[in-house]
């Protein structure tokens, strides 16, 4: 009999606004790339789930920390007309949470740490990318995995980390073990690990898209939330 865990689940009603048409990547009554045009009357429950088993190339992680992102709030928050605020890729019902860190429980067949090319060890501390890119489509091959043609997003259209355990592809995991040199308390490592995803948003804007900054440059940062502070 499968062991159980609890997860924070967001539910919403599929009710496309008048004139809405399914996009090429939308799936009727399942997911859309225009969440605020489709999903209505959101509500949250705490539900019981089977603890998932990792398949080939996947890793089972015990979640230790997970941040609350503005997008989590905007998916759970409705406008006056009942539609959710969040405009992006969404598929409900779904466990929320994507700013996560945790401990490897076990790896599925062939699951490897991309930094070492060795199998993941139980007990290794890791964090995860929020976007589950395929690695084989043209945008992925061109170095733009955030434009993946078969994109899934943790906590948006596939189950996220507001739960006790999560299974993720090995290619989307990053080891936090080097942080042992900076932190004596493992709890601090997990907190730092949960900040990797939001900090990477600021890094992508400043370095990848913005071209970087140099000593003496004058810059303006619009926003004083976690991403703005990271930038």
Where in this protein do the model-derived segments appear?
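Short structural boundary motif marking the start of a folded domain
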Residues: 2-8
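A short N-terminal beta-strand-loop micro-motif at the entrance of redox/enzyme domains
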Residues: 15-65, 87, 91-95
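Glycine-rich beta-strand-centered segment in the early N-terminal region that forms part
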Residues: 50-67, 81-138, 179-180
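Cytochrome P450 core scaffold surrounding the K-helix E-X-X-R motif
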Residues: 71-77
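NAD(P)H dinucleotide-binding glycine-rich loop of Rossmann-like/cofactor-binding domains
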Residues: 87-98, 114, 134-222
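N-terminal Rossmann-fold NAD(P) dinucleotide-binding loop
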Residues: 228-229
């Amino acid at each position: 009999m499968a062991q159980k865990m609890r997860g924070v689940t967001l539910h919403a009603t599929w009710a496309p606004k008048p004139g809405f048409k399914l996009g090429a990547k939308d799936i009727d009554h399942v997911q859309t790339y225009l969440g605020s045009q489709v999903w209505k009357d959101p509500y949250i429950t705490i539900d019981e789930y089977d603890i998932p088993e990792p398949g080939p190339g996947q890793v089972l992680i015990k979640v230790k920390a997970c941040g609350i992102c503005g997008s989590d709030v905007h998916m759970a928050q409705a406008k006056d007309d009942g539609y959710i605020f969040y405009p992006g890729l969404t598929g409900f019902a779904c466990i929320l949470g994507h700013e996560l860190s945790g401990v490897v429980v076990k790896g599925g067949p062939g699951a490897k740490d991309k930094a070492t090319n060795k199998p993941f060890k139980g007990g290794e501390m890791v964090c995860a990318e929020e976007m589950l890119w395929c690695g084989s489509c043209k945008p992925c091959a061109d170095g733009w995995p955030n434009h993946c043609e078969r994109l899934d997003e943790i906590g948006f259209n596939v189950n996220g980390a507001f739960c006790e355990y999560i299974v993720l592809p090995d290619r989307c995991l990053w080891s936090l073990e080097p942080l042992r040199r900076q932190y004596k308390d493992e709890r601090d490592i997990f907190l730092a690990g949960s900040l990797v995803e939001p900090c990477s948003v600021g890094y992508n804007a400043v370095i990848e898209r913005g071209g970087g900054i140099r000593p003496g440059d004058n810059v303006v940062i619009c926003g004083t939330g976690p991403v703005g502070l990271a930038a």
